Amino acid sequence: MSSRVGDLSPQQQEALARFRENLQDLLPILPNADDYFLLRWLRARNFDLQKSEDMLRRHMEFRKQQDLDNIVTWQPPEVIQLYDSGGLCGYDYEGCPVYFNIIGSLDPKGLLLSASKQDMIRKRIKVCELLLHECELQTQKLGRKIEMALMVFDMEGLSLKHLWKPAVEVYQQFFSILEANYPETLKNLIVIRAPKLFPVAFNLVKSFMSEETRRKIVILGDNWKQELTKFISPDQLPVEFGGTMTDPDGNPKCLTKINYGGEVPKSYYLCEQVRLQYEHTRSVGRGSSLQVENEILFPGCVLRWQFASDGGDIGFGVFLKTKMGEQQSAREMTEVLPSQRYNAHMVPEDGSLTCLQAGVYVLRFDNTYSRMHAKKLSYTVEVLLPDKASEETLQSLKAMRPSPTQ
C-alpha cells in the first residue's frame, strides 16, 4: 500500500477518518481539507494520529504568524527580486512543477548586507506556496491530482563564499521550515554540476532534512543533461540544462522564468556588516599572540572562522604544524594563509579554506607588533566535515567518466 488516496489499507483508512474527526475545529480554515491534504500529514508522521495532529496544528499557527494566505501577493525587497536566484520553469513527465535553484552565481553576503535574513527566508516560503498553487493549477488542467514539486539545484560555481555562516543559516532554517510545514510535497531534489566542495556544503544542511527527504536526493554526474531528461521532457527543460525550451527571444537560459542571481551592487547595501555572535572571547596581550589549534583528520575538510577585535587592528594567519605535541612559533610551521593585519576593530572578518592535507592547523592571532595595547578578541572557529555518502557518490560518478580517446 502506498498510503495515498485510493491505495490505503483498512487501518490507514480508519486512521484518516479518525484524523478528520479530531480536526473538526480546523477543517473550515485549512488551506485544503481533502483526503490528499490530510494524508500528507499522516504519512509525515507514519500515521501516528497525535503526532500528525500536533504537526498540522503547529503549521496552522505558522500560517497565521507568517500570513501565508496573503504571501503570494507579498513583494520582497527589490534587491531580493533582482539578485536572489531561482525560478519555476517547466513540468516533469507527470505534470509536477519544476523549480530551479541556481547556487553558484548567488552573492550571499551581498544579499544579507542588503536585506534581512527574515526576508530571505520569507521569499523561500513564498516559493513553497507558489509551488503548491501551481500544483492546484496543474490538477485542474490535467484532471488528476498533482501534489508534489521537483527541485533542481545547480551547484556549478559553489565556493567557500557560499559557506559563510549567516548564508548557511538561511538554508538551514529554510529546510527546517520545509520539513515542518510542507511535508510530502517534494518529489525529488536533483543536484547537478556538484563540485568537490558539495559534500561539505551538504553536511551543513542535511541534519535539517528528514530521512525521507534525503532519500529523494539524486546527484547526477557528468552526463547530467542526458540524465535530467529522464525526469523532465526536453520541451519542458531550458536549453541551458539540456532541453529545447527557450525564451520567446531565443535565450537558452529562459531568463523570463529563472533568475540567475549575480553580484549585488554595493548601492543596495544597508549596512557594512552582519551582526554575529562569537563563541570565544580572549585577550591578546601587548607584544604577544594567540594560537588556536584545530586537528584535521582527513583532506577535504573546511576551516571556517569569524573574528572581531577591540582596541585596534589584529594580525591573522593560518599555519600547519610540522611537529605534533609541542608549541611551535610561526616561523617553525608551514604557512598556509599568509599573516597580515586586519582592521577587525572596524569591520568583523570572516573566511574559510579547504584543508588539502590532514594535520593540526593553527589560526594565529598576532599582536606582537603592538608594544602598548592589548586587544580583546572575539572569535568562532569551526571545522566543516564533508558528508561521506555524497562524497562517495561524487567519487563513483567521477570513476564512471569515459576515458579520453587517444
UniProtKB/Swiss-Prot annotation:
Probable hydrophobic ligand-binding protein; may play a role in the transport of hydrophobic ligands like tocopherol, squalene and phospholipids. It comes from Homo sapiens (Human). Disulfide bonds: none annotated. This is SEC14-like protein 4. The gene is SEC14L4. Residues 76-249 form the CRAL-TRIO domain. GO terms for cellular component: cytoplasm. One of its GO terms (molecular function) is lipid binding. PANTHER family: SEC14 RELATED PROTEIN (PTHR23324), SEC14-LIKE PROTEIN 4 (PTHR23324:SF42). Residues 252-383 form the GOLD domain. InterPro entries: CRAL-TRIO_dom, CRAL-TRIO_dom_sf, CRAL/TRIO_N_dom, CRAL/TRIO_N_dom_sf, GOLD_dom, GOLD_dom_sf, SEC14/CRAL-TRIO_domain. Gene3D superfamilies: CRAL-TRIO lipid binding domain, GOLD domain. Keywords: Lipid-binding, Transport.
